[in-house]
């Protein structure tokens, strides 16, 4: 069985990474929306394993440990700091179990994960030291549990992304580092998206790019510029929602679809985004365009589901286990072309 490293795989073609665990696990009934703490690894590990395997079946080459928001400060917020290490190790063990039982002829890569701490304060040494400690302990656990790569993601402060990369680079593992700017073309500390990515490459990021917050329409223009400038591999993992030039992220995305029962809070985020979901063809088109630009590390973040991950994989020319079950309207009773289908039913399609 082949067991290539991340960079070798990227040098030879696309690598698919399923993210977006928060939303999908919440939809499956195993996580509280808004709070978004991944207790599932302790409380319902089978549910987490099932999602990993569904993503694997759909074509994800990377099994990313679900430790997003599973850091010390978030665990303090919910009063469960004592469960910090057990939660992280449980998530890593589940991911490793899935990664080492691949469906194809090559091992999957298990990824340790660190992300935005929501504790960062610009020009605050105490904040920086605390964030460094948070990242370092999570990286140490990931290495100890056999991670093949490390992913740092969803950073909206450039300096926090630099710190995350520094901590990850203390290991010998390949690093993926992605930023998630809000509605502007710069991060919260005023550094442009392009300059942040250039700096991350210069500091040794093996794969640099963007994830989360923005849908395909408002992420792809930035990815085009990043790909033009960076020499390293580039990552693109948008959310699966129809963000616009007026509303570049999903945080203030309006529902203009005739909703008669809006969410009880001010925004559609995070519990009423469903009407703005991209369809599979939009996601496939994004993946194809990004891949044609030379972006080989691709996936979906919030809003990801196995069907959409399959679309990403197939859009870049891959055949995955789930390809067996892709759409087939040939035998649909009203839209199909099978000779056994009744004409008077098919003729009614425009009135259905």
Task: Annotate each predicted stretch with a short phrase.
Residues 1-352:
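Domain-level signal for soluble alpha/beta catalytic cores
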């Amino acid at each position: 069985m082949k067991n290539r490293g991340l960079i070798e795989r990227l040098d030879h073609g696309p690598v698919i990474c399923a993210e977006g665990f928060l939303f999908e696990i919440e939809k499956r009934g195993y996580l509280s929306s808004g709070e978004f703490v991944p207790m599932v690894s302790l409380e319902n590990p089978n549910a987490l394993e099932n999602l990993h395997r569904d993503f694997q079946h759909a074509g994800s080459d990377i099994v990313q440990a679900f430790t997003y928001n599973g850091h010390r400060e978030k665990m303090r917020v919910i009063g469960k700091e004592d469960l910090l290490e057990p939660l992280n190790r449980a998530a890593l063990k589940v991911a490793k179990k899935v990664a080492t039982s691949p469906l194809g002829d090559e091992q999957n890569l298990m990824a340790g994960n660190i992300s935005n701490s929501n504790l960062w304060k610009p020009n605050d040494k105490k904040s920086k030291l605390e964030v460094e400690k948070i990242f370092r302990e999570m990286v140490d656990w990931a290495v100890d549990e056999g991670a093949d790569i490390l992913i740092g993601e969803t950073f909206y402060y450039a300096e926090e992304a630099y710190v995350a990369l520094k901590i990850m680079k203390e290991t010998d593992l390949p690093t993926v580092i992605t930023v998630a700017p809000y509605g502007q073309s710069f991060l919260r500390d005023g550094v442009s998206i392009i300059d942040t990515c250039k700096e991350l490459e210069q500091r040794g990021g093996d794969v640099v790019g963007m994830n989360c917050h923005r849908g395909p329409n408002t992420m792809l223009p930035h990815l085009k510029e990043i790909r033009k400038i960076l020499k390293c591999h580039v990552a693109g993992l948008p959310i699966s929602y129809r963000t616009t030039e007026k509303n570049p992220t999903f945080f203030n995305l309006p529902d203009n679809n005739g909703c008669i029962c809006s969410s009880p809070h001010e925004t559609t985020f995070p519990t009423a985004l469903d009407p703005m979901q991209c369809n599979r063809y939009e996601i496939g088109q994004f993946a194809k365009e990004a891949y044609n630009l030379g972006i080989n590390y691709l996936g979906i973040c919030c809003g990801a589901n196995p069907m959409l991950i399959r679309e990403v994989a197939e859009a870049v020319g891959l055949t995955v286990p789930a390809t067996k079950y892709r759409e087939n309207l040939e035998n649909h009773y009203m839209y199909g072309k099978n000779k056994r289908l009744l004409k008077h039913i098919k003729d009614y399609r425009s009135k259905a």
